[in-house]
Swiss-Prot record:
Keywords: Hydrolase, Metal-binding, Zinc. It comes from Streptomyces coelicolor (strain ATCC BAA-471 / A3(2) / M145). Disruption phenotype: Loss of amidase activity on mycothiol bimane, leading to dramatically decreased levels of N-acetylcysteinyl bimane. Increased sensitivity to a number of alkylating agents and antibiotics including N-ethylmaleimide and lincomycin. Binds 1 zinc ion per subunit. This is Mycothiol S-conjugate amidase. Its EC number is 3.5.1.115. InterPro entries: GlcNAc_PI_deacetylase-related, LmbE-like_dom_sf, Mca. SUPFAM superfamilies: LmbE-like. Belongs to the MshB deacetylase family. Mca subfamily. It is an enzyme of class 3 (hydrolase). The gene is mca. GO terms for molecular function: hydrolase activity, acting on carbon-nitrogen (but not peptide) bonds, in linear amides; zinc ion binding.
Amino acid sequence: MTDQLRLMAVHAHPDDESSKGAATMAKYVSEGVDVLVVTCTGGERGSILNPKLQGDAYIEENIHEVRRKEMDEAREILGVGQEWLGFVDSGLPEGDPLPPLPEGCFALEDVDKAAGELVRKIRSFRPQVITTYDENGGYPHPDHIMTHKITMVAFEGAADTEKYPESEYGTAYQPLKVYYNQGFNRPRTEALHHALLDRGLESPYEDWLKRWSEFERKERTLTTHVPCADFFEIRDKALIAHATQIDPEGGWFRVPMEIQKEVWPTEEYELAKSLVETSLPEDDLFAGIRDNA
């Protein structure tokens, strides 16, 4: 009898799950995979990015509650489970020099202690596969970088009963694979950019490509390409549910859906660790697991 496949996606803030790997999650849900999103913070220090909602006094005063409601709506759209890790948003520091991070925020937590909270989730849910961000956080937000750190510690720590005793953290369990989300990769961005220009359409990616080198991003190894074009509409619907964070008329939604599906019908990942044999490149996060489950 085949064991239930389970995928855990670890994210920093509400809305990250809908902008990074959402179509992949929706695809796996449709196949009967149990998918759980773990959200590390409440996004309390996030700015209101939707111009139509800026200046709304209720939202500004109740941003934590509003973002939780948005997360719940997105969760229902994607069909996933979702749990909070309970840490406080660090905010994105700006200025030169950068100001210190606020006391008590996620990025200043002890890594091993914070990872212990994720160990509890892993031991309870028992996913074979975990997704998160690379060591740069996908982009250098302190909460994204911290999310990477605690996920990698928890991947190993979930099976370590000395570091995380079963009496406190639950029955030990070892996940089999951990991936980095790499959906915002240069090959995809360039392909969509040129596809739009070739069709005489305006591209929202031109400035993005010009600024790419400013982030000093190394080119990542895209090991895994998950076909999920049939779920792009669900992805966008979930993202729009985060109304405070997304302008539905902004550049994110300027690329016609038919072009996205034709030019780049996959979401990309980088296999960071695997305890099972697999052959690269992959088209399935459960490659090497599915046949043995």
